[in-house]
Structure formats: C-alpha cells, structure tokens
C-alpha cells in the first residue's frame, strides 16, 4: 500500500502573512474578511496573522517574497482583484502577479497562495468575493492551512 500524504485544516500553532492589494478595495476587503474568517474558524489565533497592504496587485509579489524570506510564517496568502478594462494592462498585471506568486512559493518552499481575482467584470469580482461563487479569500486561507500542514508531513 502506498504512503499517502495529506494536509488537514487545523490551524492551531500556524502563523500566516497576508498581502492585500488596496486597488479595488471594495472587493479586496471582502476577500480579506473571508480569509480571516477561515483562519479563525480553523484555529489560527489573531496574533498569528500579520497583514500587509500594498497599492495594487502588481506590488503583491515583492511583499509576499519579503514575508516568505523572513521565515516567520507557515504560509503567505496573497489577495487582490484585477478587473479587465479596455487596454491590455489586465493581461500584463494578471500574468506577472500569478507568475511572481508561483515563483516565490517554489523558491521558498513555502505555501504562497494565489488569492488574486482575475475577472472580466466587476460583477464577477463581487460574485467571487462572498456572494454567488463563494469567497476566494476563504478558499485561499483554507489552501494555506492545508498546504502548511501537508509540507510538515513530507
């Protein structure tokens, strides 16, 4: 029988950094609320959560890297919202942020979770920030807890 490794959703004793983009703040505040709720419900103490605000999604990877490099956290949760406009700016920002977050995670061997919405419309962002399509901040926090615990077992 093969050995199976799985993470679990018990957050006691875990510490997380959260990076939040302020651009589209009416959405990112909801993502942050969802993430904080998930962390609390899974046993992460308030004093084990640190939040850094950045101007927008493009700035998220730099602060996430600084947090990951500090070795103070079991995971870093990145939250932001990039909404398509009439120019190619959306593609550039979305691509660079997603690549940056993935690279930090791989380079640091730390769960750096991508909770950045990349959507076509404001309505889609609202749906993913706590209405019809759930709250992606909540989902990102759950992924961070699960991955932090999984990496401790491998």
Curated annotation (Swiss-Prot):
Pathway: Cofactor biosynthesis; riboflavin biosynthesis; riboflavin from 2-hydroxy-3-oxobutyl phosphate and 5-amino-6-(D-ribitylamino)uracil: step 1/2
InterPro entries linked to this entry: LS, LS/RS, LS/RS_sf
Enzyme class at the top of the EC tree: transferase
Keyword tags: Riboflavin biosynthesis, Transferase
Residue numbers binding 5-amino-6-(D-ribitylamino)uracil: 23, 57-59, 81-83, 114
Sample GO molecular function, one term: 6,7-dimethyl-8-ribityllumazine synthase activity
Keyword hit for Transmembrane: no
Active site: 89
Ligand binding ((2S)-2-hydroxy-3-oxobutyl phosphate): 86-87, 128
Keyword Transferase applies: yes
GO biological process, one term: riboflavin biosynthetic process
Pfam families cross-referenced by the UniProt entry: DMRL_synthase (PF00885)
Catalytic activity field: (2S)-2-hydroxy-3-oxobutyl phosphate + 5-amino-6-(D-ribitylamino)uracil = 6,7-dimethyl-8-(1-D-ribityl)lumazine + phosphate + 2 H2O + H(+)
PANTHER family with a match to the protein in the record: 6,7-DIMETHYL-8-RIBITYLLUMAZINE SYNTHASE, 6,7-DIMETHYL-8-RIBITYLLUMAZINE SYNTHASE DMRL SYNTHASE LUMAZINE SYNTHASE
Record family assignment: Belongs to the DMRL synthase family.
Function description: Catalyzes the formation of 6,7-dimethyl-8-ribityllumazine by condensation of 5-amino-6-(D-ribitylamino)uracil with 3,4-dihydroxy-2-butanone 4-phosphate. This is the penultimate step in the biosynthesis of riboflavin.
UniProt protein name: 6,7-dimethyl-8-ribityllumazine synthase
Gene: ribH
